[in-house]
C-alpha cells in the first residue's frame, strides 16, 4: 500500500512541485525561478476567469444535484423488489465512462438531428449551442444525468439507517410529512449530505472530459474551466513550469475544501 501511494501520489506531486519553481529550456535543462510562475498566474485574467468558471460550475451542480438527489431518494420505496430494481436502474449512469457520456450528449445536441436539440426546436425554442447560456444549461443537465445517481444512493442509504422508532414517534405526535423531513430525516442525513457535497464539489471542480468533448471550452471561453487551462498549458503548449504552478494551486484548493468538509464530517460523527 505504501509503494502504491508513493508511485501514484508522492512521486507525481514531487515532480509537479519541482516544475512549478523551475523553467525549462533546450529539452531537459531546468533553471530555478522561485515563485515567478505563481506570481504570473495570480496576475493573469485568463487564470482567474477559468478558476471562477470552475467554482461557478461546481456551485451550480451542487445546487441542482443535492436537492434533486434528496427528493428522489425520499420518493423511492425502502423495501421490496421495486426498491432493488430502482436502485439498479438509478446506478446505471454511474457505470458509463465520462468520455462516453460526453459523446452521447454531443450526439443528443447535434443541430437538426439530435434528440434534445430537435425536440426543443420543435417547441419553437431555439437551441443554439453557440449561446453560452444554452451551453451551460446543457453541461448542467449532462452532469446531473450522470452524477445525481450518486447523491440518490447516498441519501437512500442514509434514510434506510433511520430507526423506525423515529417515524412511529412522529406518527403519534401527528407530524406532517414536511415536519418529519425537517425534524427527523434531514438531521439524520447531514453526515451523508456533507459527504455527497464534498464528492460532487471535487468531481465537478475538476471536470474535463465530458465538458471538453461536448463544448471544446466554447463558445469563446465560456466553458473553458481550470482543467482545460491546465491541459492546454501543460500538454499542448508544453509549458511545464506554468502548468506545474497551476496544478499546485488547483490541488491546494481541492485540499482546503476537502479539509473543511472532513473537519465537519468528523465533528458531526463525534456528535458535536
Where are the regions that the model predicts?
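A structural signal for multi-pass alpha-helical bundles of membrane permease subunits
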Residues: 1-272
Amino acid at each position: 500500500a505504501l509503494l502504491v501511494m508513493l508511485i501514484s501520489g508522492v512521486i507525481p506531486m514531487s515532480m509537479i512541485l519541482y516544475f512549478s519553481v523551475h523553467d525549462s529550456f533546450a529539452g531537459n535543462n531546468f533553471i530555478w525561478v522561485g515563485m515567478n510562475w505563481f506570481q504570473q498566474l495570480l496576475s493573469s485574467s485568463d487564470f482567474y476567469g477559468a478558476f471562477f468558471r470552475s467554482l461557478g460550475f461546481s456551485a451550480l451542480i451542487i445546487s441542482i444535484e443535492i436537492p434533486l438527489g434528496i427528493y428522489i431518494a425520499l420518493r423511492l420505496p425502502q423495501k421490496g423488489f421495486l426498491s432493488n430494481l430502482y436502485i439498479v436502474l438509478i446506478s446505471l449512469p454511474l457505470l458509463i465512462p465520462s468520455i462516453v457520456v460526453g459523446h452521447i450528449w454531443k450526439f443528443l445536441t447535434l443541430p437538426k438531428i439530435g434528440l434534445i436539440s430537435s425536440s426543443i426546436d420543435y417547441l419553437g425554442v431555439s437551441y443554439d449551442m453557440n449561446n453560452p447560456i444554452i451551453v451551460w444549461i446543457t453541461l448542467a443537465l449532462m452532469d446531473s444525468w450522470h452524477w445525481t445517481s450518486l447523491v440518490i444512493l447516498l441519501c437512500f442509504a442514509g434514510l434506510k439507517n433511520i430507526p423506525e422508532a423515529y417515524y412511529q414517534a412522529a406518527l403519534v405526535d401527528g407530524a406532517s410529512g414536511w415536519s418529519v423531513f425537517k425534524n427527523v430525516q434531514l438531521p439524520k442525513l447531514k453526515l451523508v449530505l456533507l459527504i455527497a457535497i464534498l464528492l460532487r464539489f471535487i468531481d465537478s471542480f475538476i471536470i474535463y472530459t465530458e465538458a471538453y468533448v461536448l463544448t471544446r471550452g466554447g463558445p469563446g471561453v465560456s466553458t473553458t474551466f481550470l482543467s482545460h487551462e491546465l491541459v492546454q498549458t501543460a500538454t499542448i503548449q508544453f509549458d511545464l513550469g506554468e502548468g506545474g504552478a497551476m496544478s499546485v494551486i488547483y490541488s491546494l484548493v481541492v485540499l482546503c475544501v476537502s479539509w473543511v468538509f472532513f473537519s465537519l464530517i468528523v465533528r458531526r460523527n463525534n456528535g458535536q
